[in-house]
Curated annotation (Swiss-Prot):
GO molecular function: RNA binding; translation initiation factor activity; translation initiation factor binding
Xref: SUPFAM superfamilies: Winged helix' DNA-binding domain
Composition bias type Basic residues, residue spans: 884-894
Region (Disordered): 1-28, 162-235, 824-894
Subunit relationships: Component of the eukaryotic translation initiation factor 3 (eIF-3) complex.
Identification of the protein by name: Eukaryotic translation initiation factor 3 subunit C
Cellular component terms per the entry's GO annotation: eukaryotic 43S preinitiation complex; eukaryotic 48S preinitiation complex; eukaryotic translation initiation factor 3 complex
Keyword Nucleus on entry: no
Stretches with biased composition (Basic and acidic residues): 845-854
Amino acid sequence: MSRFYRRGASDSDTDSSEDEVEELKANKSAKFRDDLDFMAGPEEDEKRVVRAQKDKKFDELKSLIKQNRDAKSNKDLNKLLTGFDTLAKAYDKSKTIFQRQNVTNPRFYIRFLVEIEDYVNKLWEDKEAKAALSKNNTKALSPLRQKLKKYIKDHGLTDLVSDYRANPDEDGYETPEDENDEDDFEEVPEASPGRQAERAADSESESDSDDDDSFNWSSEPDTNSSDDEENVTKMEQLRRYFLKKEFREESKDDKKDKRKRVIKVKEVVEEDDDDWTPVSREKSVVHFDPNEEVTHDVMIKKLNEVMSARGKRTTDRNQHVANLQKLLEVAEEKQLGLGISVKISFCIISALFELNAKISDYMEYETFMNTLRTVNTLLDLLITTDRVKLSVTYAEEDENLKDENEEYRIQGSILIAVQRLDGELAKILQNADCHSNDYIEKLKAEKDMCQLIEKAENYVELRNHLGIFDKHEVCKVYMMRIEHTYYKYQDQNVGEVAKTMDYLCNKIYTLDDEKRLRQRAMLCHVYFLAVHDKWHRARDLLLMSHMQAIVDHSDVDTQILYNRTICQLGLCAFRHGFIREAHQGLSEIQNTQRAKELLAQAVGTRPHEKTAEQEKIDRSRQVPYHMHINVELMECVYLICSMLLEIPHMASCEFEMRRRMLSRSFHYQLKQSEKASLTGPPENTREHVVAASKAMLNGDWKKCKDYIVNEKMNQKVWNLFHNADQVKDMVVRRIQEESLRTYLLTYSTVYSTVSLKKLASLFDLSKKDVHSIISKMIIQEELSATLDEPTDCLIMHRVEPSRLQMLALNLSDKLQTLAENNEQILEPRTGRGGYQGPGSWFPGRNERQGDKQKGSGGFQGERRGGPGGPDGKRGNWGSQGGQQRRHPQKPRAF
């Protein structure tokens, strides 16, 4: 309909048409305005950022580096390997952009490469941490290490990495790329006032045009003009959006101010002329009223009030300790007596132990030293005065804190505090880095702890006649001193320390009723004797205690101590030259392949088999580092003992089909060495012993000695013994003797007579020693020979077959076994006159008990039915007897 006819329509039609047109126009305008606002929004509300391509690449690299660092912190090496490949590809793509803009290698990228390389190398060298990795992480570790090394070398980053290691960035330092990262975010300045006025005018004109259209939209010229103005305005806004602006630089100080967090401070409003005082969150505890006299009752009441907050969740533990210390100062200032002072001091010690929310958490070193000083002060006070009795047998009603005419009686035990303090020191050492100076500093506290334990022992001996101690507490004090003494080797005053050790152990043997402390004291005593080379006494004490029979029923800590004692006893036997005894003692630990775990020197290598709680318990049982037994030394001693025992045994049983092994682990090492296609010079102690074993098997004792005693072995093994020269002489002597025995057993079928003088010169032994060794071999029937004294010769009887004869016998045995196996395989396939019924396949069914009673050799009767053949029988189930027991049929081989 044209507008001319539309003007003449009725009012109702006009109103309805106006509404329709307005709605249509409003919807169209709103849709276009939304699209325009989407584009123009950043300019009006936010500051638009124009960034260079270099900055975008920097952001991409930093994002990938952050992902890799997250994977490193989570110890996800598989994800770290994938992330490193992605990062390397992204960096290679970005190098062209960097070269185009004359940008060198970013320092943050070099820093990341150094961090990852250090992390991977540290993890590679740490055997315990590497063993604790999962299977996927273990597989990813080696490729990651190789890729990282190859990437740095191929991309020419070796010099940059070395320069960074020489001058690393400090913590919190930002590289120029990091500092300019935000500078590159160039910001568009806000619109000028003139431009804002222009916008306001445009908006007003737009609103005016809208109003005119709403009231007088029927006129064609006005409508066209308003549409043109609106289009011009929209195009102007589009032009402004895509227009490049001039940028202004902000100072770095302004940017740093923007980075700082804005702290909103609430204003203190004054109302009704009242003075308002800001109150802190922590309540300031007012202990006493200034107008009140501080007496014993007031102090006890205030102490109970402070102690009532103990253990509550809302209680500040540090503030609780401070309150008790303030009470102690007031009590000493007012001179309220020893009873109050000792009671408050004991409460302070308990509060210091409770600073940690969890018992499993270890105490901070500063808190430990503070507690140690407090316990030491209280113990000095208890030793100097005999008017104070501190015992767990007293109840709270029986306490006497204020009556000076009587003895002060206080509930508590200073011995339990000393025991718990000793446990806290062990936790601190367990959680400290054993390869740092921090561990050494913390280890110095053990000296103070030992002095405190000796002081507690003196206090027990002074007050034990009063009956204020429990028997178990007294045994614990003696046991603590034993546990701080038994593993230490004493160069000086050995006699005094040995007497002290005997005295302490005898005290526990007498007083303890639970047997656990007696067992531990016995094991510590044996350990102490073994460390100080008292071999026979230590062995007899261990055998008399029968610990090897009852240790399986003991607790885990006692089993760990037993394992440590057995290892130390084996090392002691080796130092004395008792090779077989040393081998037996060390084999119990070395054959399990879990030596560190059994000695509580490391957590198990398979943590997935244990729950988190079990793993935490295992970590709490770990022995501090300064008490460790050198596992590498122990393994080397075990392998040397195995060599001295196994090589002569192998020579005597060379051609036996089934020979007995004395050491499976030693044979495993020999087999692994034989499998190697190329054998280089030995590097570690294990390879030295294997090479020496091969030389001994050939009778070359000098080469064997050179492998065992050299500079490298001196540093790793022999210098760790306090009598290193004696031990090395003993080992060389045993190598000569066992090499002689191996030589005679190997070549006994070759010689008819051997001169003793020749043997003595060959193995650098005296004629007397050679005669003694050969005589012992003849007596033990290891060698079939006779000593001819007039000629000083060894005459071989040659009863044993020669090497060729032994090989022929072995071959005949194997052929006989092969023939028997073939007969058994072919026997079920050969026919025996055709099918004779189902019983013919089961030889055990040839004859039955019922058939014997009938007097027949087989089943001839009729069962379950009519005749089955021409003679009226169902079948013949066997015609031969003689076997009443049914044997299972051998499996058929095809």
